[in-house]
Amino acid sequence: MASTATVAAGQPASRYAIESRYAWLRLAVSLTIMTIGGAGMYAVPVTLPAIEAEFALARGAASLPYTVTMIGFGLGGVLMGRVADRFGVLVPLVAGGMALGAGFVAAGMAPGLWAFCLAQGLLIGLLGTAATFSPLVADTSQWFDRRRGIALAICMSGNYVGGAIWPPVMQHFIESAGWRQTYIGLGVFCLLTIVPLAWLMRPRPPALVTTPQVPGSTAVRSALPMGLRPRTAQALLCVAGVSCCVAMSMPQVHIVAYCADLGFGAARGAEMLAVMLGMGIVSRLVSGWISDRIGGLRTLLLGSVLQGIALLMFLPFDGLVSLYLVSAMFGLFQGGIVPAYALIIREHFPAAEAGARVGMVLMCTLLGMALGGWMSGAIFDLTGSYRAAFLNGIAWNALNLAIVLFLLSRVYAMRGRLGRA
């Protein structure tokens, strides 16, 4: 679809039109930046055993850096999204690259837990990784219309590409050089890559267009999204985001420590995390393709059911080979959940409100990851095993499933009323 907007002085609008060649190039740059910035999310799970040993921490306390990172990540997504809305995506990306560089160096030199948490939460989470996530998701949604689902899936796959790359790379350098040197080197790398790439994102997006109706989608154009008041619908999506990600965080945050406790070693756990997130890339892309055909709510329902099944599979199986298989299954089943929220909002809410609403729901998913990471560690400290933590994740996943089913029932009821009118 051609846009009539001219987004760069002296350049014809068609060059920077929606779904143009430049839009796909921009998507590739967004994917690369999100992959690099994802190091901020996956550094702590890999370094958790080393931090626990060096600072003499209990498992719950050792999980605290991940929790503050995800809280900062969530709050920073809203903050950086507003900065991007006002100044363009270039400003938060440059600031984020500099913050990641400073944050990893500061964390690598931290004398104790609280200094480490401060660097993780403020520089890496709030100002760093957050700038490479929500602003890029919102930016991508403005460059695509008919292929918005797959475009969002590709963009947000950077989160999982980073998860597939960073754990084994970091584990290698932690074993050979130590976690502190690994952090410092990672900070230098982020600074030297993200800031130059950000300059390729200077053109502003073309004018927003109306989201097209997806064949088979549950979207119904109404002043009442999903048959509910806007605040109620938004609140339910936020609670759903928290609950699905509390469940999702248990294997992602604790699989390395879980494998170490089982006697397989942290390196095997890092490999399982990489497998899990690598399969998440496949899941995210396939789910994006599916969502362009069945809509966001049905895609979220499918992901919620499959994630619950995968979590159940962790309970009876704790052998090395079986854990590799279950980790792959978990990654393959849950990768499409978070992108579905962005698509649901674009389908059921006005386009002019999409940026703020997407940022809020993504913040809640990240807060869910933070809560789940801490909660699983605390449950381990109380019970001495991860079985209760897995059961806790399954319960939160059931809450997510119940909310999605309720929203779908409201949509179908509203469609029925409109059909009889």
Give residue ranges: language-model regions.
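Helix-loop-helix hairpin linking two adjacent transmembrane segments in secondary transporters
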Residues: C155, N159-P205
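Hydrophobic core of transmembrane alpha-helices in multi-pass small-molecule transporters
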Residues: T35, G103, A115-A131, V242, ...
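Interfacial helix-cap and linker-helix signal at transmembrane-aqueous boundaries
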Residues: I51-E52, V83-A84, I165-A177, C259-A260, ...
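Conserved MFS/SLC helix-loop-helix module at the cytosolic interface between two early adjacent transmembrane helices
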Residues: L75-W114, S291
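Extracytoplasmic gate region of multi-pass secondary transporters
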Residues: V44-L48, R231-W289
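Extracytoplasmic
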Residues: L25-R59, M80, W166-P167, M250-V256
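Structural signature of the two symmetry-related core transmembrane helices
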Residues: V91-V105, R298-M313
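Cytoplasmic helix-loop-helix junction between adjacent transmembrane helices
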Residues: Q120-S157
